[in-house]
Curated annotation (Swiss-Prot):
The family this protein is said to belong to: Belongs to the G-protein coupled receptor 1 family.
GO molecular function, one term: olfactory receptor activity
Residues in compartment: Cytoplasmic: 50-58, 121-139, 227-239, 293-310
Protein name in the entry: Olfactory receptor 5AR1
Record: glycosylation sites: 5
Disulfide bonds: 97-189
Cellular component per GO, a single term: plasma membrane
Residues spanning the membrane: 29-49, 59-79, 101-120, 140-160, 206-226, 240-260, 272-292
Pfam families named in the record: 7tm_4
Organism taxonomic ancestry: Eukaryota, Metazoa, Chordata, Craniata, Vertebrata
Species of provenance: Homo sapiens
Subcellular location: Cell membrane
């Protein structure tokens, strides 16, 4: 039967990560632990930063927002994924699919700009330390974060409109574990050429603009570090930037692999595991990446634990 002659889709069925019932139980346990670590880590980071006055600085303000967006986009995906591991009826309505998609896209794209703002903050701290209080004032920090969330909102509306204005009238089986752009485009019975161009252009703009900010910031930072006479100063600068560079590499590497390529090169199995990595694993890793070697966060944690034990 031609797709055009089929009835319109009102719900989708996820194939999930695996069809093996035993593996589903194993994956449920593993990803439940990962998600709980994610939730505890990111909420813990938010609580530490908001309650400890020593962490009321631009760098930790941005880190608090990073934890929030990490928690946001992982929570748009993980609870549903965990529930689907325990059932054979992996059905999601068209409207619920659009809602899941919208929240996921909004938080992920906001994270791109939060990471760019963090790079700018490090640039000012290392390259313009005498002007730090001016360039990174409370008003500037708030404006940067509001701009990040506004960019996420605009992207949310654009992506959701472009993706869900397409016709879905043939198979309703999504070979994935959540509603994501590539499998939805592959499923549509519309001509997706224009939508693909617009969607990938928007993704490309978000990626390019934020990576450009990060690249320029770290180019100036690298030059400043090379010019430092003190080995201790260079070590401190590298320590300040190391965790952020690790987080950027993990996040952008996976997102670029997922979205900045045509659907003709789309590999279902590869992309499922890439999606698992950046929807579940990276949000869990970020609190660890940014806190393990951070003396201020460790001190705040010990202080908080000390207060509760008294």
């Amino acid at each position: 039967m031609d797709k055009e002659n089929s009835s319109m889709v009102t719900e989708f069925i996820f194939m999930g990560i695996t069809q093996d019932p035993q593996m589903e139980i194993i994956f449920f346990v593993v990803f439940l632990i990962v998600y709980l670590v994610n939730v505890v880590g990111n909420i813990g980071m938010i609580i530490l930063i908001t309650t400890d006055t020593q962490l009321h600085t631009p760098m930790y303000f941005f880190l608090c927002n990073l934890s929030f967006v990490d928690l946001g986009y992982s929570s748009a995906i993980a609870p549903r994924m965990l529930a689907d591991f325990l059932t054979n009826h992996k059905v999601i309505s068209f409207s619920s699919c659009a809602t899941q998609f919208a929240f996921f896209v909004g938080f992920v794209d906001a994270e791109c700009y939060v990471l760019a703002a963090m790079a700018y903050g490090r640039f000012v701290a290392i390259c313009r330390p005498l002007h730090y209080s001016t360039f990174m004032s409370k008003q500037v920090c708030l404006a940067l974060m509001l701009g990040s969330y506004l960019a996420g909102l605009v992207s949310l509306v654009a992506h959701t409109t472009l993706t869900f204005s397409l016709s879905y009238c043939g198979s309703n089986i999504i070979n994935h574990f959540f509603c994501e752009i590539p499998p939805l485009l592959a499923l549509s019975c519309s001509d997706t050429y224009i939508s693909e161009i617009l969607l990938f252009s928007l993704c490309g703009f978000i990626e390019f603009s934020t990576i450009l900010i990060i690249f320029i910031s770290y180019t100036f930072i690298l030059v400043a570090i090379i010019r430092m006479r003190s080995a201790e100063g260079r070590l401190k600068a590298f320590s300040t930037c190391g965790s952020h560079l690790t987080g950027i590499t993990l996040f952008y590497g996976t997102v670029m692999f997922m979205y900045l390529r045509p659907t003709s090169s789309y590999s279902l199995d590869q992309d499922k595991w890439a999606s698992v990595f950046y929807t579940v694993i990276i949000p869990m890793l970020n609190p660890l990446i940014y806190s393990l070697r951070n003396k201020d966060v460790k001190a705040a944690f010990k202080k908080l634990i000390g207060k509760k034990s008294q």
